[in-house]
Amino acid sequence: MLDKTWQKMYEEAKSVQKFRQISDHLEAGGVAAAVLSNTGRIYTGVCIDTACTLGVCAERNALFNMITCGENHFKRVLAIMSNGKDGAPCGACREFMVQLMEKDYKNIEVLMDYDREEITTLGELTPDWWL
């Protein structure tokens, strides 16, 4: 069984996942994410999709919230897709995470599937960084 922290992260991400059409060119909330900072605080974010591709993924949005609140390091991340399933961060999110925690990124835990309790690490998903 997933520990209580994973469960709380999942619940908090689910609570902000509210799809909404903001304008003819912008929608938000289809995907939601939660990150666990090294201090134990959970930060959430939702994806923001725009017609001109200037949107942002839920994972990066959650990390931006963490950074805005003065924290710079995290140890866990999860994302809930629009179909209710969990999934791996996209390439852009992985790149951002690696740049944020260049020396420690390989140990960041990623929830791949809540129902199957499948967890991997960012190091497994991104074994070699291009820089």
For the regions a protein language model found, what residue spans apply to each?
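Hydrophobic "anchor" residues
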Residues: R41-I42
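Feature captures the catalytic cores and cofactor-binding loops of soluble hydro-lyases/lyases
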Residues: N61, N65-T68, P89
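Histidine- and/or cysteine-centered catalytic micro-motif in compact active-site loops
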Residues: L36-N38, C47-I48
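Compact, glycine-rich, soluble single-domain proteins
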Residues: V46-A58
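Short beta-strand scaffold segments in enzyme catalytic cores
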Residues: A28-S37
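C-terminal binding/interaction regions
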Residues: M1-S23, E71-L131
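Short amphipathic alpha-helical face segments that pack within enzyme cores
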Residues: C57, N61, A92-E95
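Short connector loops at helix/strand junctions that flank enzyme active sites
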Residues: A28, C57, N72-F74
